[in-house]
Amino acid sequence: MSIPKEIIFEEEAREFLLKGIKKLADVVAFTLGPKGRNVGLEKSWGAPTITNDGASIIRDIQLEDKYENMGVAMAKEVVQKIKEKCGDGTTSGALLLRSLVEAGIKNISSGASPIGIKRGMDKAVEVVVKAIEKAAIPVKTKQETRNVAVVSASGNQEIGELIAEAMEKVSNSGAITIEEGKGTETSIEVVKGMKFDRGYVSPYLCTNLEKMIVEMDHAQILLVDKKISSIHELLPVLQATAASGRELLIIAEDIDGDALSTLVVNKLRGTLKVAAVKAPGFGDRRKAMLQDIATLTAATVVSEELGISLKEIPATALGSAEKVTVTKESTTIVGGTGAQEDIAARIKQIDAEINLAQSSYDKEKLEERRAKLSGGVAVIRVGAATETEMKQKKQMFDDSLNSTKAALEEGIVPGGGVALLNASKTLGQLKLEGDEAVGAKIVLQACETPIKQIVQNTGFDGSVVLNEVLNSPANFGFNALTEKVEDLIAAGVIDPAKVIKNTLTYAASTAGIVLLSEALIADADDEEEENSTK
């Protein structure tokens, strides 16, 4: 029998969505900026998590009202998209969403057309994003890298210094991982390792469901230069792995069919500790990259061309690494057991191929391979006195690292909400009429939200300081640390352009969906449940 449904319409529906979004945004609002506060999250066991990271706070929020919860789900999607794309800016994204939806609903209630408002918002966002891209300054020095890292770590100088140092040690070619240390001191170590752009083949293989990643310690690594569809091919390896109790990472051309389904079922049952990813590259380049990974991990590539079969695989064919981390989009291998002389010989071979390369494309790809093999992985081991402090510091390191990477990709802009404010000034050039003009004005007002919130969290009047900033030169803004309006670029208060433009883009996209929503449908409350709550 189908479950009865409840339906609410138009203004009532939008108001419920807004209530959910506002509750969620209100929780994270006071965490914004270097003088933002913390939020405590109850855990079913152990110490509570104390954090000022918007994504961590928002992730577990579930409201009692089913319609408000739909609004929360929409806000969560914005935060998740920003987190995946940039790693930072989640709190600003939630505040922008609240501002856009609140102003949009207010105007719709006054008779404006939702479609016209959305069209105007889309045009305004496009103009603001282009202005941010135009204003972006490339990151060239270690000091600029450090400044971005410090700002993203809520002004923590130690974290900024360590992230900048790690970046310098491995350059753009290497990878950086953040781990929990065993003492109170935080340290950096560069180890043999590699990162490549291939994620897990199934999310059901994740070991850390909170972050949706696979984490393995002292894992064995199987490299296969073909597609695996039948579980029978893998049985000898899986039986040996299960007997040893070690974790296994499979890197193959592809894994599907009953091979994948059996791996997933056994992983969920706890019978096997296994993960699988597709091999990086295509064709001959894939074969070469598999050989690079084999050199790094002391493995042998299982290939029919070499006369090695999966069914009769020698024990020595499996490589190993101290730590493996697999996300939705990438795989990082840390501490491979390959001999240093073998890695050096492999790099020398790639150098020879670079010298012989005819096309610039081939040369570029070979240089990428060389960089991955020689760059290594910088491991930052975070030290803290308590578990609660450890979790908070590790989260700050993660945010700082993600922001710094974003800054290196697309450049920096003045921080403290000033980049959005400056970019929104270009909306005066946009000649719109009617409801489209209303939509553009809503975006203009939303762009003032982050700076006003940062000022309020510092203990000042947001509107008063905003007026002072609007009458100041282009890069001037409110520095929450010094509590005065000054040149933020010169003061080192900077944000990654990529983060700023994506927070606005994703917030506006979801706001448009909310404004165009005319009805909400949910399961009807059970009569017995209603009576029991009375």
From Swiss-Prot:
It comes from the Bacteria. One of its GO terms (cellular component) is cytoplasm. Disulfide bonds: none annotated. ATP binds at residues 31-34, 416, 479-481, 495. Its EC number is 5.6.1.7. It catalyses: ATP + H2O + a folded polypeptide = ADP + phosphate + an unfolded polypeptide. It is an enzyme of class 5 (isomerase). GO terms for biological process: protein refolding. It is found in: Cytoplasm. One of its GO terms (molecular function) is ATP binding. CDD domains: GroEL (cd03344). Keywords: ATP-binding, Chaperone, Cytoplasm, Isomerase, Nucleotide-binding. Together with its co-chaperonin GroES, plays an essential role in assisting protein folding. The GroEL-GroES system forms a nano-cage that allows encapsulation of the non-native substrate proteins and provides a physical environment optimized to promote and accelerate protein folding. Forms a cylinder of 14 subunits composed of two heptameric rings stacked back-to-back. Interacts with the co-chaperonin GroES. PANTHER family: 60 KDA HEAT SHOCK PROTEIN, MITOCHONDRIAL. Belongs to the chaperonin (HSP60) family. This is Chaperonin GroEL 3. It comes from Protochlamydia amoebophila (strain UWE25).
